[in-house]
Amino acid sequence: MIPYLPYQRKPFLNFCLEFFHFPILLVPFGREKRPNTEIQPDGGCKMRETDLADELFGQPGKTALPAGVRVATARQGGVTITRVEIAREGLARPRGRYVTLEMPSVSVLDERDTDVIETGAAELRALLPPEGPVLVLGVGNRRVTADALGPRTVQKVFVTMGPRTVPVPGIRPVAAVAPGVSAATGLSLQQLAGALVRELRPAALLCVDSLCSAEPERLGPTLQFSDSGLHPAQPDHSRHLDAARLGVPVLAA
């Protein structure tokens, strides 16, 4: 997942930020009545909401961690890796493993950056089952730039599942779909994901979605992988997907 800034409560005003090679549209409708920002002592502005586990629980040695939370940081292949493990329920995020990767902005990366690619692939592979088909779900609205990461990613997935595909040695069966949004389909994300899982019976569901970040400078260079399922900060629980609801491991990226 790549973070975006949370929605603002500023009617009649759209904020456009540079992201990849196209602008981000921040929808001017708030999710809550309270302000979404707080002023820092240095005069800067910080968002209150975040989907990133390392922003919620801080860095090791800098903030006191609640019981049941472990945080570790490492650097590999030009990537700073922060691993957050939540071992109990009742905290700000569901129980599970969260891996945050900070790297050069994805807008300047290409296939030549093999160290970054291999590091990210290794972290994602560690969360997936060792074998079996994977269904990639591109979550989001392709018509809204800030929410289009999932559908755009699905367009680039190497699909190896299907009656006319030829098995590739060393690559597991992979299917990919962008289910759209409920306003366009009339179906919730849970309904569509459940139907696909029942039909395909994958070993795991990998959801690709945009994330909400509290720090504007993390737009672009930050990814998060998680094995706890898809749990956006939004109050709309019809977008939440996890193993308890679907019966298969659900990863978010």
Please annotate each region the language model reported.
Residues G44-G96:
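N-terminal amphipathic/basic leader segments beginning at the initiator methionine
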Residues T100-P104, P133-V144, A176-G180:
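Short glycine-rich or small-residue beta-strand-to-loop segments that form or flank ligand, phosphate
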Residues I86-P129:
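An N-terminal, well-structured beta->alpha segment
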Residues R172-V197, R201:
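A structural-propensity feature for long, helix-poor, extended segments
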Residues V139-L149, A183, S210-A214:
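Gly/Ser/Thr-rich loops at beta-strand to alpha-helix junctions
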Residues M1-R9, F20-P28, E32-N36:
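Short terminal hydrophobic/aromatic SLiMs and anchors at protein ends
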Residues V177-A178, Q191, C207-A253:
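A structural signal for small-residue-enriched, beta-sheet-centric alpha/beta enzyme cores
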Residues N141-R172, A176:
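Glycine-rich phosphate/diphosphate-binding loop of Rossmann-like nucleotide-binding domains
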